[in-house]
Amino acid sequence: MPRLLRLSLLWLGLLLVRFSRELSDISSARKLCGRYLVKEIEKLCGHANWSQFRFEEETPFSRLIAQASEKVEAYSPYQFESPQTASPARGRGTNPVSTSWEEAVNSWEMQSLPEYKDKKGYSPLGKTREFSSSHNINVYIHENAKFQKKRRNKIKTLSNLFWGHHPQRKRRGYSEKCCLTGCTKEELSIACLPYIDFKRLKEKRSSLVTKIY
């Protein structure tokens, strides 16, 4: 019995030592510069590709443009060529591809109108993907705009919490502060907050894209 008690006390002591080390790690500031700073933030946030994350954060509408162009291309512009387009009159110089492209875009806009849907029960190109309505795209754009506004407000609030009332530190910047004076784990974890919001936006975006298709 005394032996078991000694072992349990020893195990408890080791656990307390480990816990105190972790606490000191969190509260102690470490000087991190350049790629070492990026690696530490990556380890904290668990995100592997930061260059891709920055690109998607800065251009949230790029996917929307790509999806819109895919939907127009799905209609194959050559299927909308009219007899006038196929054999243009002399001297006009009409480009059959550009004219067909305009007809494809006009057809896409018409199919998103409720009046057109009432008149036409089915699409002549049943095998192609159905187009999203303008309402769904407006919801998608509204979600992105709301995310950008929320992100700007959060960064402004976190900047005040992080730097306090030190304009010189604010000018110095996050990475320079971590390099010159050091950052604690709590301060480094601030960089994870935009990524958490970005993950939530991606979940909303995937649900919206599912509705569109």
UniProtKB/Swiss-Prot annotation:
GO terms for molecular function: hormone activity. Residues 1-20 form the signal peptide. Keywords: Cleavage on pair of basic residues, Disulfide bond, Hormone, Secreted, Signal. Gene3D superfamilies: Insulin-like. Testis specific. InterPro entries: Insulin-like, Insulin-like_pep_6, Insulin-like_sf, Insulin_CS, Repro_Hormone_Insulin-like. SMART domains: IlGF (SM00078). Residues 55-168, 201-213 form a propeptide. It is found in: Secreted. It comes from the Eukaryota. One of its GO terms (cellular component) is extracellular region. Disulfide bonds join 33-179, 45-192, 178-183. Belongs to the insulin family. May have a role in sperm development and fertilization. This is Insulin-like peptide INSL6. The lineage of its organism: Eukaryota, Metazoa, Chordata, Craniata, Vertebrata. The gene is INSL6.
